């Protein structure tokens, strides 16, 4: 938090877990597909592999997780050194676009966890990158998506990316609009992506 009281963070720490970078150099034993000059992202999470969450196939919920930019110094620096196994290179994706993968993935994961199908009406509150990920993934699964935000430009993007309906919660009554859109049934799934 801005007050520095997040119990997960050990200060001081360099932030930065949404990583888009270009590989500067590689060490010995690094596979040939990881080459200097190649844009990449970094998997920012390091799981222990032995806690109950890891043993149950949920390394994202590892009790001893070490995330770049949270528990370990992150990418808001000129250079970072990372194990090659964390590097995801692709010469076709820019480092700027790579930085969007982590937050988009959070939205995609929320849709998977919500088991959203083409039978669902999904309300996504917040049209930042996590919300956009949820909107895109829900639309790809055939759900009817209702995007809610206070920013008309974000709502316009949400519409272009698959939202069937948009609601500006600053200028419209959300409850009334939901009732109109859903014939008084409301959404089947709500994803809060405001933070």
PLM features per residue range, with description:
Residues 185-191:
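Short SAM/SAH-binding signature in class I
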Residues 48-125:
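NAD(P)H dinucleotide-binding glycine-rich loop of Rossmann-like/cofactor-binding domains
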Residues 44, 170, 194:
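Glycine-rich, N-terminal phosphate-binding loop of Rossmann-like dinucleotide-binding domains
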Residues 93-172:
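Mid-domain Rossmann-like dinucleotide-binding core that forms the NAD(H)/NADP(H) cofactor-binding site
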Residues 172-184:
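Short amphipathic alpha-helix with an adjacent loop that forms part of the alpha/beta core around
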Residues 78-79, 144, 165, 189:
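Well-ordered beta-strand positions
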Residues 3-52, 91-93:
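Glycine-rich beta-strand-centered segment in the early N-terminal region that forms part
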